[in-house]
Amino acid sequence: MMNRGRRHEQGSGLIVVIMVVALLMGIGIPLLTLTSMSPKVAGTMRYHEEAFNAAEAGFDAARLLIEENMTNGSWSGFAGHYLTLPLGIDIPMILGVPNPSYFRRLTDQEILQALDLNGDGTADVPNLLYFQQTFAVNGQGQTDLRYTYTVFLINNEAGGGLANNTDALLVSIGTVRAGTRVLDSVRLEVLVTFEDE
């Protein structure tokens, strides 16, 4: 009788060991997955921050350019400096229907492709303040082609509203690239005004 009880105890011990191993695997596998993903997440966050910095650099450069043009009298307002091509990029509604070509309905990559249809790195439309402008310097003191900004003005009254040429929506798209592939992009939109003195 004694042997029978021991065999029963040995069998229950095996079940406990299997349950403990299963529990440890249930905790360990997700933990391994999580720790292997954190470098990817950190990389994605870094690209996003770099793209934001590029967009901010574009905004700063455009602000200085606009101030200079207003100060020296080259510009008396924003009329004639708005982005209007590709056709419809500045018009939110056409005959009461949402315009699919409106810049806010396009991704950053779609906007950049629409501005450079043949993909040669040169803008195919007028009235861009900057197009894929580099601004950073790498460790060897050379221009770093990975970081660029594209900046343009949109008439915030286009497609309706009271027309005036004293304000505009300044749009700055910062991009981070690896070769020709865009790793991340950030778009800033800031309403800028011109006050006649």
Question: Which stretches of residues belong to each language-model region?
Answer:
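N-terminal secretory signal peptides that target proteins for export/translocation
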Residues: 1-7
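N-terminal single-pass transmembrane signal-anchor helix
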Residues: 7-32
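N-terminal membrane-insertion alpha helix
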Residues: 34-42
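Conserved functional hotspots that engage anionic ligands or polymers and/or phospholipid headgroups
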Residues: 3, 12-15, 29, 41-42, ...
